[in-house]
């Protein structure tokens, strides 16, 4: 997106946006340093786990927003870019207090919806686990792995196990090993953590689209201009489609994104109704 757009030229980096960027980047660097220097990964206490996981703690609904993917820079980079581009405009429009309230509520709301969606997505796997425990076997195990284990986790050791079992299907030891593997796969999926400020960023995105629907946004790929309201609709539709696909190889929290948009929309409607009762205040207006 093109920051030379006149709407964004007015978006000075304000205090809350600046502070959030500093805190988020510092948190990401601190986690990296802890792993590299102390062999301690504090993100396992701060990332958001499903409420059915033994690793879940209530404070994670707040702290997960400041954790990001450690395997690369792009996750945190694009989130902070979105925070700066959209957040700066919104903080100027709302003021720091309302902006921070909105950012945190949409982020935590996105976390709640993400956990609920994850439970829905995992239910078929839990049913498959029970079915396998009741009737274990080579064919059933192969199907379970294909349906429930992300491709990135399927390695040579697993393939060798399947190959050996194929030629020794009467050996009960393979059944016992497969049961342990099924439970490990189930635990791995259940204990997958959610990290990132994306829920809040998508909340900012819908707020920008509703407050300034006719603002022109220049996309990077493809490089075409688009009104904010259409940009939000397209992004929301893509996230909904991707989330409903429930692809186990997709490592993106689509329902966290949708959750941020939904909570943001509800909060905007509440504020609009309340603010309409205040004389002279127009919560939905164009930037000058």
Language model: regions and residue ranges:
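A detector for small-residue-rich transmembrane helices and their helix-helix packing motifs
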Residues: 1-288
């Amino acid at each position: 997106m093109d920051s030379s757009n006149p709407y964004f030229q007015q978006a000075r980096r304000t205090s809350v946006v600046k502070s959030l960027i500093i805190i988020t980047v510092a948190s990401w660097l601190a986690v990296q340093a802890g792993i590299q220097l102390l062999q301690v990964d504090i993100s396992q206490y701060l990332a958001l786990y499903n409420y059915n996981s033994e690793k879940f703690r209530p404070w994670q609904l707040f702290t997960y927003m400041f954790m990001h993917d450690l395997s690369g820079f792009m996750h945190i980079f694009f989130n902070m870019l979105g925070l700066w581009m959209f957040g700066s405009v919104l903080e100027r429009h709302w003021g720091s207090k309302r902006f921070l309230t909105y950012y945190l509520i949409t982020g935590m709301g996105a976390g709640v919806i993400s956990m609920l969606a994850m439970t829905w997505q995992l239910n078929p796997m839990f049913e498959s686990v029970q079915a396998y425990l009741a009737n274990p076997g080579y064919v059933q195990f192969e199907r379970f792995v294909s349906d429930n284990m992300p491709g990135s986790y399927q390695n040579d050791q697993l393939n060798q196990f399947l190959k050996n079992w194929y030629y020794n299907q009467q050996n009960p030891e393979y059944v016992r090993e497969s049961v342990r593997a099924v439970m490990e796969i189930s635990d791995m999926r259940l204990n997958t953590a959610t990290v990132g400020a994306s829920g809040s960023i998508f909340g900012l995105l819908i707020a920008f689209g509703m407050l300034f629907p006719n603002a022109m946004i220049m996309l990077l790929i493809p490089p075409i201009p688009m009104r904010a309201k259409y940009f939000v609709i397209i992004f929301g539709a893509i996230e909904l489609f991707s989330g409903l696909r429930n692809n186990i190889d997709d490592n993106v929290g689509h329902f966290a994104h949708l959750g941020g948009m939904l909570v943001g929309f509800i909060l905007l409607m509440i504020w609009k109704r309340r603010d309409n009762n205040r004389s002279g205040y127009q919560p939905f207006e164009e930037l000058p």
